[in-house]
Design a protein with these regions (language model features):
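S-adenosyl-L-methionine
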Residues: 1-33
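Mobile active-site "lid"/loop adjacent to the S-adenosyl-L-methionine
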Residues: 12, 29-59
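Active-site-proximal loop/turn and secondary-structure-junction residues that shape catalytic pockets
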Residues: 14-16, 38, 76
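Short acidic/glycine-rich loop or secondary-structure boundary segments that cap or lie
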Residues: 19-20, 40-43, 81
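A structural alpha-helix within SAM-dependent methyltransferase catalytic domains
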Residues: 23, 57-61, 89
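Short amphipathic alpha-helical segments
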Residues: 23-24, 44-47, 84-85
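Helix-to-beta-strand junctions that scaffold the AdoMet/dcAdoMet cofactor pocket
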Residues: 64-66
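C-terminal catalytic and target-recognition region of SAM-dependent MTase-like enzymes
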Residues: 69-139
């Protein structure tokens, strides 16, 4: 997967108003990367990756072109890899998403030496930062 990495190809804005604007103007994208904080509350909406990551994925899914890609990242420490996989598999049941690949965090990127066991088991991922590449199909 190769996407040109020029600044004009990336949008970093407040999630909820931006998604609403794109939906109302019928803007579609080949690839969406969703990497929210694990928890945030603003007057515009709430992000809670521990309890409701599926809702955020479902908000961006309609913005992705048929055959496009969604890179979904969940870095909530208290969400195990298995729990996140169950969420993703549940989202894939209707056939509009499918899991293409899980991306493991490289050892040299983690930035610390693990001491003891993680808070939750990250398997099938190798780190609490859980990254999945999903293929998107539209009606």
């Amino acid at each position: 997967m190769a996407f040109p990495s020029t600044k004009n190809n990336f949008i970093a804005q407040d999630f909820f108003p931006t998604v609403a604007k794109f939906k109302s103007t019928k803007q579609f994208f080949d690839c969406v990367i969703i990497d929210p904080p694990f928890f945030s509350t603003t007057p515009k909406g709430k992000v809670d990756l521990e309890n409701d990551s599926a809702r955020l994925i479902n908000k961006v899914r309609p913005l992705i072109n048929n055959g496009g890609t969604l890179i979904a990242i969940n870095n909530a420490l208290y969400v195990s890899g298995q729990e996140y996989m169950q969420t993703l598999e549940g989202l894939c049941k209707d056939g509009y998403l499918s899991i293409r690949e899980l991306i493991l965090v490289p050892d040299d990127f983690i930035g610390y030496n693990p001491i003891g066991k993680p808070i939750t088991d990250p398997a099938p991922f190798n780190h609490s930062t859980k990254i999945a590449i999903l293929d998107v199909r539209r009606k």
